[in-house]
């Protein structure tokens, strides 16, 4: 297709990088890969402080996966109906809620509900990313614009576990770290 982006033009990668919208949305797009990777990378520590069995906790992963798949399928219709610009400010809220529930909760039910909310944001993220870039930057140079955002997200996945690991090494409480991640996701939502 030959869809135009903002200002009725096809944006180059250089033009996209120099435009404020690119930098305004990169934080909300980075949050799910950074936080999800950090969360799952540190699940042994989480299960230890919550006094959960690692096997029982991982048995709850289908709730994450199922919600992610369900939300991915539904988000296409939602984005078509309301538009990416209306959904983007809200798509990190389920992740925030999931992190909040897991931070304060101590039961497997809390873990199950929290994982479902994390999966909801993951499902939304998969569809929102594919919709946002062509809508805002056009399709002619979509590969080069998306490759920049994707490589930034891949880099972000390496930062999450490293930052959380350092915070834990410095003696910070993991529940407080999860709460901080919740707050950062909410801030990124409204940015």
PLM region descriptions:
Residues 67-71, 121, 152-156:
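MFS transmembrane alpha-helix packing/gate-lining sites
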Residues 124-137:
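Intracellular juxtamembrane helix-capping segments at the cytosolic ends
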Residues 139-171:
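A late C-terminal transmembrane helix in Major Facilitator Superfamily
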